């Protein structure tokens, strides 16, 4: 392929796409540059469809290379390891807008790899990778109903900003990523600081103007260098077989679908499947997979027909009805905060743990080093859906759901100054029937309030669905698993009473317009307020007191020049304070100091020890010190942690001393006076000058008796 370069202006910066330059053996490859960010995106597909599967085998990889920011990986191996959490989330961001645009029934393996080669903090590499994936697929022979365009939108000083710079992102009230085709929106992801729904909607519409420009730009590239699409050979089911299965199974599936309870419904559907397979096994012994596919079609059609014609869902709810909700807080006696949130057959246990400031998570990647004071982890065990499978580490889904719930609560987490703790939330899915991520949002709010974290406002989440048949559009509130599986949209919205804090929208159709988005957002707000009301019936506000098992934090501000004194030589001083009090100490460069203690008494003791260190030693001051060592010429006495001086043998007493041990021994607490601090900072002490007059008089009387 001939090397070609294409350029366009996007939000005040040049977007440059080069094709035919590198990776020429891939089906499609694009070298994309935006600002100083460079991403290589490749797309490859297998020549033959994968046999025996009923899904589209698409994989997306987002490869972070630390050389892109001029760094060498840490650790012993010195090379990149498994993908970071950020890389996994970026891969999901690329995957979601392109997945619905492949032909239905396409079963060839497709792999999209985005390799980040150079990073400009002002040009987010994930946005560049999303554009690059659309280019690579569109110019290739892989069947793809694109192209798509993608942009980020910020809200800075009341104005929308496309692809905001690093500085603008820091100031922005929201971070919105929107993908779409020329005609419709296909994916939305957002984190926001209680932004009204109308503003979110306006931002999506504003983004679509730029998406259209990107799509037009990519269409121009396709005209110049695109190759003809490969012919898709889709598996066709024998018409006679399909007619017979439909005639035999449709009513049975309809009746099984009308079962309100998920497990019973699934059992009934399984029975129908087994009955149908048994009925046709002799007539069509080699077409059992085709029969399964027909049964899936019937189930999808019947569920959607029920909603469209009867306005009733499989569990008997109306389109706007929310499943029964119950909540409980303080369910675990020894944790810092805990809650169970149940909505229908979806149930999540969320546990809050408070830690020291030093427990923050340090994230190293191709962006700036990040420090996370608040984190949310999501676990989805197999028992939550009644299955048996090996327990492994968190997968992409768990990481994605955890990040969504984390983003939803982030705007209401108190600042470090208000609440000097690291906060970790863990959501354990106990039972799943749709929208576990939004149940995690609700459970997180309850657990934080139970822990006494002074959140700015409670947050709730709800998942909306869509059934779109020709011109008829039906929005479903609080979708369950089967409605997500067989419906056209999964639109998760989380927020406070005031506004939206997080959005995630995925669709299975080519796109949706503003009217559908507006309808979904309005219904989501109404549902969210209802859920919030139910939650606040259980706990109205954060508890006034922390759990007795939670650590206590004592805050101090010290002179930054005294930090090295607190730490001491080779860390001896701070280690001694920690070992004697059982606390954890975190010191910032500006002098802010946090003592995290198991109880207030230990915290106050550590504080007093630190105050003694940071207090300047004054000549003429009298201190109670501890004898650390004895030498023939005197005693070394510690008058403050890490600060010791010498009491010469001649200054131990007002009478003549022959041996130091005759007056003091190691471990004695004695009063001493600072008589001198030399140029090297060495402290000269005197015991005799610290003696009260009475002791001096007693010494004289004793001396007279001896005479």
Swiss-Prot record:
<dbReference type="InterPro" id="IPR015847">
    <property type="entry name" value="ExoRNase_PH_dom2"/>
</dbReference>
<dbReference type="GO" id="GO:0005829">
    <property type="term" value="C:cytosol"/>
</dbReference>
<dbReference type="Pfam" id="PF03725">
    <property type="entry name" value="RNase_PH_C"/>
</dbReference>
<dbReference type="InterPro" id="IPR036612">
    <property type="entry name" value="KH_dom_type_1_sf"/>
</dbReference>
<keyword id="KW-0963">Cytoplasm</keyword>
<dbReference type="InterPro" id="IPR036456">
    <property type="entry name" value="PNPase_PH_RNA-bd_sf"/>
</dbReference>
<comment type="similarity">
    <text>Belongs to the polyribonucleotide nucleotidyltransferase family.</text>
</comment>
<dbReference type="GO" id="GO:0000287">
    <property type="term" value="F:magnesium ion binding"/>
</dbReference>
<dbReference type="InterPro" id="IPR020568">
    <property type="entry name" value="Ribosomal_Su5_D2-typ_SF"/>
</dbReference>
<feature type="region of interest" description="Disordered">
    <location>
        <begin position="688"/>
        <end position="707"/>
    </location>
</feature>
<keyword id="KW-0548">Nucleotidyltransferase</keyword>
<dbReference type="GO" id="GO:0006396">
    <property type="term" value="P:RNA processing"/>
</dbReference>
<protein>
    <recommendedName>
        <fullName>Polyribonucleotide nucleotidyltransferase</fullName>
        <ecNumber>2.7.7.8</ecNumber>
    </recommendedName>
</protein>
<keyword id="KW-0460">Magnesium</keyword>
<dbReference type="InterPro" id="IPR012162">
    <property type="entry name" value="PNPase"/>
</dbReference>
<dbReference type="InterPro" id="IPR036345">
    <property type="entry name" value="ExoRNase_PH_dom2_sf"/>
</dbReference>
<feature type="binding site">
    <location>
        <position position="490"/>
    </location>
    <ligand>
        <name>Mg(2+)</name>
    </ligand>
</feature>
<dbReference type="GO" id="GO:0004654">
    <property type="term" value="F:polyribonucleotide nucleotidyltransferase activity"/>
</dbReference>
<keyword id="KW-0479">Metal-binding</keyword>
<dbReference type="Pfam" id="PF00013">
    <property type="entry name" value="KH_1"/>
</dbReference>
<dbReference type="GO" id="GO:0003723">
    <property type="term" value="F:RNA binding"/>
</dbReference>
<dbReference type="InterPro" id="IPR001247">
    <property type="entry name" value="ExoRNase_PH_dom1"/>
</dbReference>
<feature type="compositionally biased region" description="Basic and acidic residues">
    <location>
        <begin position="698"/>
        <end position="707"/>
    </location>
</feature>
<feature type="binding site">
    <location>
        <position position="484"/>
    </location>
    <ligand>
        <name>Mg(2+)</name>
    </ligand>
</feature>
<dbReference type="Pfam" id="PF03726">
    <property type="entry name" value="PNPase"/>
</dbReference>
<dbReference type="Pfam" id="PF01138">
    <property type="entry name" value="RNase_PH"/>
</dbReference>
<dbReference type="GO" id="GO:0006402">
    <property type="term" value="P:mRNA catabolic process"/>
</dbReference>
<keyword id="KW-0808">Transferase</keyword>
<dbReference type="InterPro" id="IPR004087">
    <property type="entry name" value="KH_dom"/>
</dbReference>
<keyword id="KW-0694">RNA-binding</keyword>
<feature type="domain" description="KH">
    <location>
        <begin position="551"/>
        <end position="610"/>
    </location>
</feature>
<dbReference type="InterPro" id="IPR015848">
    <property type="entry name" value="PNPase_PH_RNA-bd_bac/org-type"/>
</dbReference>
<dbReference type="InterPro" id="IPR027408">
    <property type="entry name" value="PNPase/RNase_PH_dom_sf"/>
</dbReference>
<dbReference type="InterPro" id="IPR003029">
    <property type="entry name" value="S1_domain"/>
</dbReference>
<dbReference type="InterPro" id="IPR004088">
    <property type="entry name" value="KH_dom_type_1"/>
</dbReference>
<dbReference type="GO" id="GO:0000175">
    <property type="term" value="F:3'-5'-RNA exonuclease activity"/>
</dbReference>
<feature type="domain" description="S1 motif">
    <location>
        <begin position="620"/>
        <end position="688"/>
    </location>
</feature>
<dbReference type="InterPro" id="IPR012340">
    <property type="entry name" value="NA-bd_OB-fold"/>
</dbReference>
<comment type="function">
    <text>Involved in mRNA degradation. Catalyzes the phosphorolysis of single-stranded polyribonucleotides processively in the 3'- to 5'-direction.</text>
</comment>
<dbReference type="Pfam" id="PF00575">
    <property type="entry name" value="S1"/>
</dbReference>
């Amino acid at each position: 392929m001939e090397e070609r370069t294409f350029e366009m202006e996007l939000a005040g910066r040049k977007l440059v796409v080069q094709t035919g330059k590198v990776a020429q053996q891939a089906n499609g490859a694009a070298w994309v540059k935006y600002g100083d960010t460079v991403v290589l995106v490749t797309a490859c597909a297998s020549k033959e469809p994968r046999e025996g599967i009923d899904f589209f085998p698409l994989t997306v990889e987002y490869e972070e290379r630390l050389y892109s920011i001029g760094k060498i990986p840490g650790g012993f191996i010195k090379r990149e390891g498994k993908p970071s959490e950020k890389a996994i989330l970026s891969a999901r961001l690329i995957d979601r807008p392109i997945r619905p645009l492949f032909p239905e029934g396409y079963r060839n393996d497709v792999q999209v790899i985005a390799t980040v080669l150079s990073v400009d903090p002002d040009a987010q590499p994930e946005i560049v990778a999303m554009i690059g994936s659309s280019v690579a697929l569109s110019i290739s022979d892989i069947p793809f109903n694109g192209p798509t365009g993608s942009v980020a939108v910020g809200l800075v000083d009341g104005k929308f900003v496309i692809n905001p710079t690093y500085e603008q992102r820091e100031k922005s009230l929201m971070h919105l990523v929107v993908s779409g085709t020329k005609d419709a929106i296909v994916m939305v992801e957002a984190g926001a600081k209680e932004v009204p729904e109308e503003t979110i909607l306006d931002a999506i519409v504003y983004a679509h103007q730029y998406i259209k420009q990107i799509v037009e730009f990519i269409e121009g590239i396709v005209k110049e260098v695109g190759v003809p699409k490969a012919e898709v050979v889709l598996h066709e089911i024998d018409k006679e077989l399909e007619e017979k299965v439909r005639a035999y199974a449709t009513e049975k599936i309809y009746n099984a679908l009308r079962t309100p309870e998920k497990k019973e419904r699934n059992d009934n559907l399984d029975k129908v499947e087994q009955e149908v397979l048994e009925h046709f096994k002799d007539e069509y012994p080699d077409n059992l997979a085709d029969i399964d596919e027909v049964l899936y079609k019937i189930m999808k059609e019947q569920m959607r027909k029920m909603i469209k014609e009867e306005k009733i869902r499989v569990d008997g709810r109306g389109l706007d009805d929310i499943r029964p909700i119950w909540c409980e807080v303080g369910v675990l006696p020894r944790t810092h905060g805990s809650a169970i949130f149940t909505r229908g057959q979806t149930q999540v246990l969320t546990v809050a743990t408070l830690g020291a400031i030093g427990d923050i998570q340090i994230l190293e990647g191709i962006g700036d080093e990040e420090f996370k004071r608040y984190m949310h982890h999501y676990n989805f065990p197999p028992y939550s859906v009644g299955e048996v499978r090996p327990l492994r580490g968190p997968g992409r889904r768990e990481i994605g759901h955890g990040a969504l719930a984390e983003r939803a609560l982030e705007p209401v987490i108190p600042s470090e100054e208000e609440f000097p703790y690291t906060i970790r939330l863990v959501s354990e899915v106990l039972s799943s029937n749709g929208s576990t991520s939004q149940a995690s949002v609700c459970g997180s709010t309850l657990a934080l309030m139970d822990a006494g974290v002074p959140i700015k406002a409670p947050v709730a989440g709800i998942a909306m669905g869509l059934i779109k048949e020709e011109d008829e559009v039906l929005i479903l509130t609080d979708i369950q698993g089967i409605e997500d599986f067989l419906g056209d949209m999964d639109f998760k919205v989380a927020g406070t009473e005031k506004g939206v804090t997080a959005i995630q929208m995925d669709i299975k159709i080519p796109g949706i317009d503003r009217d559908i988005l507006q309808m979904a957002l309005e219904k989501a707000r109404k549902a969210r307020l209802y859920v919030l009301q139910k939650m606040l019936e259980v706990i109205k506000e954060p508890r006034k007191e922390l759990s007795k098992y939670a650590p206590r934090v004592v805050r101090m501000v010290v002179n930054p020049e005294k930090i090295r004194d607190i730490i001491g030589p080779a860390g001896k001083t701070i280690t001694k304070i920690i070992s004697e009090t059982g606390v954890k100490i975190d010191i910032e460069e500006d002098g802010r100091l946090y003592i995290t203690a198991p109880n207030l008494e230990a915290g106050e003791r550590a504080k007093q020890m630190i105050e003694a260190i940071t207090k300047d030693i004054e000549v003429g001051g009298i201190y109670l010190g501890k004898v650390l060592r004895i030498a023939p010429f005197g005693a070394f006495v510690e008058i403050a942690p890490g600060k010791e001086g010498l009491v010469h043998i001649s200054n131990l007493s007002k009478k003549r001393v022959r041996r130091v041990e005759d007056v003091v021994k190691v471990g004695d607490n004695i009063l001493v006076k600072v008589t001198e601090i030399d140029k090297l900072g060495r402290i000269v002490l005197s015991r005799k000058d610290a003696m009260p007059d009475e002791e001096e008089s007693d010494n004289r009387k004793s001396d007279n008796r001896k005479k």
